[in-house]
């Protein structure tokens, strides 16, 4: 179980380190081209959730994130034992939730910086924690689908 928590801790450290680099070395709104017309590091802040929804609702985010963190830890210890994919999915979500929670507690906003242009579409700016949440949810869905297939296979036998 400790190994899984180390994954979450590593993600939080990477998330907070990258955000610290952006905050300490860039002006708000400043953008650095990494790959022209595709990937930029852009110093951006967000007081809402994904794509700025529920902007400024910090108390709501504190409550929801606390419940989610407790729920993930509970689920990890009660339902994910023995399921490596589900355990990894949960700790990746946990790392992302904690990463953005730290920002909300100490900055009252989330630091975003990964800015991609896909063709002519400017994808919403995000961070490592956001990526962790997205990847974790995808892994969770895959784990759920695989478990359903296993259960169907058992019931047919």
Swiss-Prot record:
Which coarse location class applies to the principal site listed for this UniProt protein?
membrane
Instruction: Please provide, in alphabetical order, the Gene Ontology terms of the cellular component aspect for this entry.
Output: plasma membrane
Q: What EC numbers are recorded for this enzyme?
A: 3.4.23.36
Alphabetized UniProt keyword annotations: Aspartyl protease, Cell membrane, Hydrolase, Membrane, Protease, Transmembrane, Transmembrane helix
Segments traversing the membrane: 56-76, 82-102, 125-145
- GO BP terms, alphabetized: proteolysis
Any one GO MF term held by the record is: aspartic-type endopeptidase activity
User: According to Swiss-Prot or TrEMBL, what is its membrane topology?
Assistant: Multi-pass membrane protein
Listed under catalytic activity are: Release of signal peptides from bacterial membrane prolipoproteins. Hydrolyzes -Xaa-Yaa-Zaa-|-(S,diacylglyceryl)Cys-, in which Xaa is hydrophobic (preferably Leu), and Yaa (Ala or Ser) and Zaa (Gly or Ala) have small, neutral side chains
Sorted alphabetically, which PROSITE patterns does this protein's record hold? SPASE_II (PS00855)
Subcellular localization: Cell membrane
Keyword Cell cycle in annotation: no
Catalytic residues, per the record, are: 112, 130
Biological pathway: Protein modification; lipoprotein biosynthesis (signal peptide cleavage)
The task this protein performs is described as: This protein specifically catalyzes the removal of signal peptides from prolipoproteins.
By sequence similarity, the record places it as follows: Belongs to the peptidase A8 family.
- By its UniProt entry, which PANTHER family does this protein fall under? LIPOPROTEIN SIGNAL PEPTIDASE
Name of the protein this chain belongs to: Lipoprotein signal peptidase
Lineage, highest ranks first: Bacteria, Bacillati, Bacillota, Bacilli, Bacillales
